Amino acid sequence: MTDPTDIATRYLDVWNERDSAKRRALIAGLWAEDAAFRDPIAAGDGLAGIDAVIEGVQNRFPDFRFRQLGAADGFGDYVRLSWGLGPDGGDAPIKGSDFLELTGARLQKVTGFFDQLPG
């Protein structure tokens, strides 16, 4: 298994990359071509679908960034991490946990859950 801390860092780097060409390159370097992303409000299949989900979040929250909350952990082909989404230096009003399934060193499936949403 690849190091959970490294996978979590690279995963959140993708979500925070605003340059679309750089973001697509990061996605291609981390995700499997037939990967899938699911959370309660978004779904993306394949590299283009995942990029579209990320771009949608960035457009909806242009001044927010993802940051890891606590340590990532994992076993076998699975990684779990918690994250916050908010302005730099401020409290994260949106918090969640993502479960990542890997095939080799690439993300195959990500399932996200929201732990906290603004009222």
Predicted segments with their positions:
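C-terminal and inter-domain tail/linker signature
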Residues: 1-119
